[in-house]
Regions:
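N-terminal Sec/ER secretory leader and immediately downstream segment
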Residues: 1-52, 57
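Mid-length scaffold segments of soluble, non-membrane domains
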Residues: 44-80
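Generic structural signal for hydrophobic core residues of well-folded globular domains
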Residues: 16-17, 58, 62, 104-107
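Charge-rich, acidic-biased intrinsically disordered regions
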Residues: 21-40, 78-88, 113-127
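Glycine-rich, aromatic-bearing surface loops/beta-hairpins
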Residues: 106-149
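Generic structural signal for well-ordered, non-transmembrane alpha-helical segments
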Residues: 4-7, 31, 35, 56-59, ...
């Protein structure tokens, strides 16, 4: 899923930040992500205010993954894969975020997310370094997204 693929990219983000000694937290970047997401939400018929908790949960989960990778690499071997530039990875993340907003909007046209939808998403949301609580937080925030009136 786009959601899982987005989380898988956090390994690349963490590796880049480790290599270049950048902090995981980037408040300015987060503000830009919120602004872009709210604009995309409007463009896709979603209530931009309802998308905020979902985007926050994605960013929180993304940071959790990055911190956990950094902890693993600091106590073991460092990344041994080619490290993408942050701009390339962020471009892909932005594409996935936009794809998710389109999918969410289309799904909400026929009604709210069902229990079955959430069960399906949970089974397909299996990115490394996320625990059940992290996943539950993202899915709970997803359930708050609404279409614009």
């Amino acid at each position: 899923t786009a959601l899982n693929e987005r989380m898988l990219l956090m390994k690349d983000v963490a590796a880049y930040k480790m290599k270049h000694h950048l902090p995981i937290e980037d408040f300015t970047r987060e503000q830009n992500v919120f602004a872009e997401a709210e604009e995309e939400a409007k463009n896709n018929g979603l209530d931009p205010h309802s998308i905020t908790p979902f985007i926050r949960s994605l960013m929180d989960a993304s940071k959790v993954i990055q911190y956990r990778y950094l902890a693993q690499w600091r106590t073991g071997s460092e990344p041994s894969f080619p490290i993408q530039t942050l701009s390339v990875t962020r471009q892909r993340i932005r594409q996935l975020d936009n794809q998710m907003l389109i999918i969410i909007s289309q799904r909400l046209m026929v009604g709210a997310f069902s229990h079955e939808d959430m069960v399906w998403l949970r089974t397909h949301f299996n990115a490394p370094n996320l625990n059940e609580s992290d996943i539950s937080d993202v899915l709970a925030a997803l359930s708050l997204v609404r279409r614009a009136r």
